[in-house]
């Protein structure tokens, strides 16, 4: 009984010691442990994995990313297979604990970039399979930890245009190198010369037009198939490339090979022909011919100029330029030579006057052409006969580095030559220097400066009448070395010489202050816009209110005009019919007269005249309402009434009461003429 209990406990301990994920197969073949999780639908690396596992296969699942904790402390793992998943992300130092790992399979995933930290810690890796991914970039230091141990590298079926060739050239232990089915266009010369153990190189189906001869290909036999080839041979596969079959591939044509799968894509007379069936004498190159070059070129001293030289040939020739002194022109801060044959001179000097020679060369030969450059001196502002020779002309090479010219003697840094920094910001600096009156015949000043992290000099030429210069487009937070040189004529040799005025070193401000300034300007402009908007809105509201009030009063006046009675009121005295006295009226009368020829006389014109009585207040409206219909005179009997002002002239008359009939007024005939005479002095009132 005790023995049975002990056996059960032993089985339980052994079962708990071996952790096996669900739906996976775990093989415990001592002393190794293998876990196989193929086609199990995993979305991530199982967490329940024995850390003593030697072989782990997680193929054909749906894992999208791998992290460092997935393989932490698995120091015994030798073989890791993650093929045919959907891995698109590898976290840095994911495999850092796999010190003994020998084979890593990551083929058929979705990797696009390999960085420096992806394979850190794999110091014993021998097989790295990265085929069938979407790789377009591999870091130059991605394979640094296993450069001396890697034996098999597979980069096939990716999107690689360029490969870190320097890294490939240091894989001294590599045996198989597969780079087929990519977009590689160029292979550097001699890149495989140190790969002494290389047995198979596959460059099939790329965009290679030529394969440069390599010392490795000449030392050992090269074959097209691995079957039947000696152990000390190299199997080279380069079919499916658009080969340009000229003299540059003649070395490959002379190799002993059995296959005839490669064809030529160019030149036109060899297109689609089998590479190995073309005779050697047809692998020819055309020497270069210069087809176009610049004519005689004129330039002003200190100004930029450009020289052109175009050449054709097979293969495309390389163009180099030779200066009038017979020196090869290299790319500097003053001169730039381009692959298309152009030569750019940023600052011309009188010493550049002469004949420049362009040399076009390729594998078939070379061709030369000449271009004459004439540099005209700047106009003299003073009489050259009065110039004297400067005892210390200083360096005459305008390409002198700013840092080297800054280490001059203390004499040249005297107070009168000192360059000062007047203003400084994050992206600009204002420098000033005193007038150089002791320099005779100064043509211009040359400013040259560079950053502390960049040795490339920047040149600026300014007139001799200027004593300050604003340097723009600087980088914030950088240290700059700046020197001012005076360009003048040597009175004896008539050559252009330069002498240093002074140098200064400064550090530009950080971008923070500029951001604050921009922010304050931005806030100030915003406040101005807001205040202006408020003023404009207030004016618009005021105009709208005036328009509304005008419209309301206009409608009110129109309605009042429609309701106004058109009548002619005639006032009479209170019982004084014979005298023709008219009582005072409190209403305001607007009387309009129509006269012929501007005359107010005539009975007919007086009878035809009309008057408008406008009622403007409630009191007047009440008085008009009390007038009876008999008081309103017909147009044929209308007479001009007298106003209270006229009646007040007569003390015997009163204008307080004024209602009488037309018959009473007619009886006062003796006074009619007097009344008509007085009516001429009446005035109109418009309300």
Curated annotation (Swiss-Prot):
Residues 18-51 form the LRRNT domain. The keyword Membrane applies. It is found in: Membrane; Synapse. Residues 415-510 form the Fibronectin type-III domain. Residues 673-687 have a biased composition (Basic and acidic residues). Residues 18-527 are extracellular. LRR repeats lie at residues 52-73, 76-97, 100-121, 124-145, 149-170, 173-194, 197-218. Residues 549-687 are cytoplasmic. It is a single-pass type I membrane protein. Glycans are attached at residues 73, 331, 340, 346, 383, 410, 450. GO terms for cellular component: membrane; synapse. Residues 241-287 form the LRRCT domain. The chain crosses the membrane at residues 528-548. The keyword Glycoprotein applies. Keywords: Disulfide bond, Glycoprotein, Immunoglobulin domain, Leucine-rich repeat, Membrane, Repeat, Signal, Synapse, Transmembrane, Transmembrane helix. It comes from the Eukaryota. Disulfide bonds join 309-358. Residues 1-17 form the signal peptide. Residues 287-376 form the Ig-like domain. PANTHER family: LEUCINE-RICH REPEAT AND FIBRONECTIN TYPE III DOMAIN-CONTAINING PROTEIN 1-LIKE PROTEIN (PTHR45842:SF20), SYNAPTIC ADHESION-LIKE MOLECULE SALM (PTHR45842). May be involved in the regulation of excitatory synapses. Belongs to the LRFN family. This is Leucine-rich repeat and fibronectin type III domain-containing protein 1-like protein. It comes from Danio rerio. The lineage of its organism: Eukaryota, Metazoa, Chordata, Craniata, Vertebrata.
């Amino acid at each position: 009984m005790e023995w049975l209990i002990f056996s059960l406990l032993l089985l339980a301990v052994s079962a708990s010691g071996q952790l096996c994920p669900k739906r996976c197969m775990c093989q415990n073949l001592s002393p190794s442990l293998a876990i196989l999780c193929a086609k199990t639908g995993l979305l991530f690396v199982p967490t329940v994995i024995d850390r003593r596992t030697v072989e782990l296969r997680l193929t054909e699942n749906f894992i999208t990313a791998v992290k460092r904790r997935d393989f932490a402390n698995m120091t015994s793992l030798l073989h890791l297979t993650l093929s045919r998943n959907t891995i698109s992300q590898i976290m840095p130092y994911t495999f850092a604990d796999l010190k003994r790992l020998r084979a890593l399979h990551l083929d058929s995933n979705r990797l696009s970039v390999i960085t420096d930290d992806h394979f850190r810690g794999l110091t014993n890796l021998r097989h790295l399979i990265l085929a069938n991914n979407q790789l377009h970039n591999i870091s130059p230091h991605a394979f640094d930890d296993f450069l001396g141990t890697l034996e098999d590298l597979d980069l096939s079926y990716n999107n690689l245009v360029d490969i870190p060739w320097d890294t490939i050239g240091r894989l001294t232990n590599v045996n198989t190198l597969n780079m087929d089915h990519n977009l590689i266009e160029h292979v550097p010369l001699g890149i495989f010369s140190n790969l002494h153990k290389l047995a198979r190189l596959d460059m099939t189906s790329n965009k290679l037009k030529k394969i440069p001869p390599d010392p490795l290909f000449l030392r050992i036999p090269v074959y097209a198939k691995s079957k039947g080839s000696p152990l000390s041979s190299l199997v080279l596969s380069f079919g499916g490339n658009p080969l340009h079959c000229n003299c540059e591939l003649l070395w490959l044509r002379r190799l002993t090979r059995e296959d005839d799968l490669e064809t030529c894509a160019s030149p036109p007379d060899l297109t689609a022909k089998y590479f190995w069936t073309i005779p050697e004498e047809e692998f020819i190159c055309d020497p270069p011919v210069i087809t176009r070059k610049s004519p005689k070129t004129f330039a002003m001293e200190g100004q930029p100029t450009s020289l052109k030289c175009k050449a054709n040939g097979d293969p495309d020739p390389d163009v180099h330029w030779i200066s009038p002194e017979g020196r090869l022109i290299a790319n500097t801060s003053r001169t730039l030579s381009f692959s298309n044959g152009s030569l750019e001179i940023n600052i011309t000097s009188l010493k550049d006057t002469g004949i420049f020679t362009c040399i076009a060369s390729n594998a078939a030969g070379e061709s030369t052409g000449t271009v004459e450059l004439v540099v005209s001196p700047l106009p003299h502002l003073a009489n050259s006969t009065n110039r004297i020779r400067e005892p210390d002309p200083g360096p005459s090479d305008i390409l002198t580095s700013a840092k080297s010219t800054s280490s001059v003697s203390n004499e040249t840094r005297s107070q009168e030559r000192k360059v000062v920094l007047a203003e400084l910001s994050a992206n600009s600096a204002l420098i000033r220097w005193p007038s150089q009156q002791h320099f005779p015949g100064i043509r211009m000043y040359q400013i040259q400066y560079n950053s502390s992290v960049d040795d490339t000099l920047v040149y600026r030429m300014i007139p001799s009448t200027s004593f300050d210069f604003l340097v723009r487009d600087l980088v914030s937070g950088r240290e700059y070395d700046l020197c001012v040189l005076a360009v003048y004529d040597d009175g004896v040799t008539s050559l252009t010489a330069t002498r240093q005025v002074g140098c200064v070193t400064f550090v530009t401000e950080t971008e923070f202050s500029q951001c604050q300034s921009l922010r304050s300007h931005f806030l100030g402009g915003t406040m101005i816009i807001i205040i202006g908007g408020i003023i404009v809105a207030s004016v618009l509201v005021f105009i709208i209110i005036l328009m509304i009030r005008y419209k309301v009063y206009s409608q009110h006046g129109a309605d009042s005009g429609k309701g106004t009675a058109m009548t002619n009121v005639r006032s009479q005295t209170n019982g004084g019919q014979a005298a023709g006295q008219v009582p005072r009226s409190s209403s305001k009368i607007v009387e309009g007269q129509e006269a012929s020829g501007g005359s107010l006389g005539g009975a007919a014109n007086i009878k035809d005249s009309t008057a408008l009585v406008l009622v403007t207040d409630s009191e007047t409206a009440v008085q008009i309402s009390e007038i009876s219909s008999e008081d309103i005179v017909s147009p044929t009997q209308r007479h001009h009434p007298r106003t209270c002002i006229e009646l007040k002239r007569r003390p015997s008359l009163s204008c307080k009461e004024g209602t009488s009939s037309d018959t009473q007024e007619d009886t006062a005939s003796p006074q009619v003429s007097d009344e008509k005479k007085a009516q001429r002095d009446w005035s109109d009132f418009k309300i």
